[in-house]
Curated annotation (Swiss-Prot):
Species annotation: Brucella anthropi (strain ATCC 49188 / DSM 6882 / CCUG 24695 / JCM 21032 / LMG 3331 / NBRC 15819 / NCTC 12168 / Alc 37)
NCBIfam families in alphabetical order: prfA (TIGR00019), PRK00591.1 (NF001859)
Residues that bear N5-methylglutamine: Q235
Alphabetically ordered keywords of this record: Cytoplasm, Methylation, Protein biosynthesis
Protein name in UniProt: Peptide chain release factor 1
Length: 357
């Protein structure tokens, strides 16, 4: 039996009942939407707590029936037969409740900004960056998320030197946040006549999309410069100054957007700047919570080599959790659930270990 915090469970049950009552009595109030949101957040954990409470009571009743000599023999035999199944159900429910009670990452339900940059490996690295972007696009499509391109710098032989996109939908950041880091590819390039395997890499950064309420950017802390945007070969895209560079003076973070619309460039640049500042705050908070207590999966170290995609062997290996899958073709088509679920599970295990200390 897992020792669960009964006081915390009782508080949640009490709060849920209070919200139900307030929603029923004030269906047209301004606070209804806020109450409905909290109701939705608590619904799953409260449902599991109630299910667990009922199952525990059922187990107690069955054990009493089994041990009561005055009970009919057939009923005692039935109780004896049913009890192990109920106990197994309780075990599963306790694990589910334990995970649902873990501290929530405030950014989990946010949309994300996905940044992929070609690393070592030249032309092949840019091609791989393109492959990774398509992989995430397909994964997003399977999840019903929306992917919108923010900016892209194409590679000389295809793919991307850098590509930035927003990913919007339910639980986006919770699923993608463990993708940050260095992704390495081992394969024979199409241009390689000798059939030698080349190794190249791309860096992925997944940032939670920040809102004004998450991070405040003061006007005096930013410098905005406009420049002429030039396309491939150096020609001017148009005759107006459209490229925008925003510099956050206190941190030195610089964001450049060079699409055709200056107004859109400024909005996009502010969106990315806000996300990077919010991400910086989260990274700082993680560090302050003590390096030794952070789970390896959740460290978000962008310089850490997290995954290798080996094409000749048809395998993908996530080095943080020592997981190897021999279905590289499916992974590249966006079949990421097994990897993502394993990373989330490992992170939850680390959180449980932390709470136990």
């Amino acid at each position: 039996m897992i020792a669960l915090p009964q006081d915390r469970m009782d508080q949640l049950l009490k709060r849920f009942s209070m919200i139900e009552s307030q929603m029923a009595n004030n269906p047209d109030s301004e606070t209804y939407v806020k109450l409905a949101s909290e109701y939705s957040e608590l619904q799953e954990v409260v449902g599991k707590i109630r299910e667990l409470t009922d199952s525990r009571k059922e187990a107690v009743d069955l054990a009493a029936m089994r041990d009561d000599a005055s009970t009919d023999a057939e009923m005692r035999a039935l109780a004896l037969e049913e009890l192990p199944g109920v106990e197994k159900r309780i075990e599963g429910l306790e694990q589910e409740v334990q995970i649902l009670l873990l501290p929530k990452d405030a950014a989990d339900e946010k949309n994300a900004i996905l940044e992929i940059r070609a690393g070592t490996g030249g032309l092949e690295a840019a091609l791989f960056a393109g492959d990774l972007f398509r992989m995430y696009e397909r994964y997003a499509a399977e999840k019903g998320w929306r992917v919108e391109l923010v900016s892209a710098s194409e590679g000389d032989a295809g793919g991307y030197k850098e590509i930035i996109a927003t990913v919007s939908g339910k639980g986006v950041f919770s699923k993608l946040k463990f993708e940050s880091g260095v992704h390495r590819v081992q394969r024979v390039p199409e241009t390689e006549a000798g059939g030698r395997i080349h190794t190249s890499a791309a860096t992925v950064a997944v940032l939670p999309e920040a809102e004004d309420i998450d991070i405040e950017i003061r006007n005096e802390d930013i410098r905005i410069d406009t420049m002429r945007a030039s396309g491939a070969g150096g020609q001017h895209v148009n005759t107006t100054d459209s490229a925008v560079r925003i510099t956050h003076i206190p941190t030195g973070i610089m964001v450049v957007q060079a699409e055709k619309s200056q107004h859109q460039n400024r909005a996009r640049a502010m969106q990315i700047l806000r996300a990077r500042l919010y991400d910086m705050e989260r990274q700082k908070a993680d560090t302050e919570r003590s390096e030794s207590r952070r789970s390896q999966v959740g460290s978000g170290d962008r310089s850490e080599r997290i995954r290798t995609y080996n094409f000749p062997q048809g395998r993908v290996t996530d080095h943080r959790i020592n997981l190897t899958l021999y279905k590289l073709d499916r992974v590249m088509e966006g079949d990421l659930d097994e990897l993502v679920d394993a990373l989330i599970s490992d992170h939850q295990t680390a959180l449980l270990t932390e709470l136990g200390h």
